[in-house]
Amino acid sequence: LHGRRFSNGRILDLGNKGPTLRRSDRLLQLAQGLRILHVGCCDHLPLIHEKRQQGLYLHENLCRVATQCVGVDTNAEGVALLRSTGFPQTYTPDDAPLTSVVDGKEQAYDLCLLADVIEHVGNPVEFLSGMRRYQFKRLVVVTPNAFRWRNSWPGGEAINTDHRFWFTPYTLCKVLVD
């Protein structure tokens, strides 16, 4: 990952052996009972209401299982919508608390979650460097996998038109260590 040895044909074992949890279920499991900072909490604005009705809205589900759930998003309209619908600890990046505050005491967040964010950012390394302003004990970054079966339609590319990048497990790790 640090570029000490070069290979133009290395095969990375992805560990895809046996049954696994759905990604959303695993994220809820990781957040259980923790103080979390959820970066990119708004999702795509047109999808929030629909996902909430279906019980699939990640930020809402995280807030149900976490001890504290602070949401951060660059979408000011989405932040306003969430605040008006029962999520008062939702902020734009400039207003977000850098630490978790519990009983008047500042503490590092237990978990900082970047779920489906990194693929939207023009400069992922710079963005991740900027995340250092927040205090957290653990960082979890998830993104759509470039290798997932839905992306391999014959003769076409299934895309989210807001994405700037596709990551593989290895290339995401390379960006994270930069």
Please tell me what each predicted stretch does.
Residues 2-15, 20-21, 81, 122-178:
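S-adenosyl-L-methionine-dependent methyltransferase catalytic module, highlighting the catalytic core
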Residues 16-35, 45, 52-60:
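Conserved alpha-helix/loop element of class I SAM-dependent methyltransferases that forms part
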Residues 28, 96-108:
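Short amphipathic alpha-helix with an adjacent loop that forms part of the alpha/beta core around
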Residues 33, 108-109, 136:
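Local beta-strand N-terminus motif with an aromatic residue
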Residues 35, 67-68, 138:
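Residues at the starts of beta-strands that form the adenosine-phosphate
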Residues 41-100:
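Class I SAM-dependent methyltransferase SAM/SAH-binding core
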Residues 113:
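A conserved beta-strand element that flanks and buttresses the S-adenosyl-L-methionine
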Residues 116-120:
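A short His-aromatic
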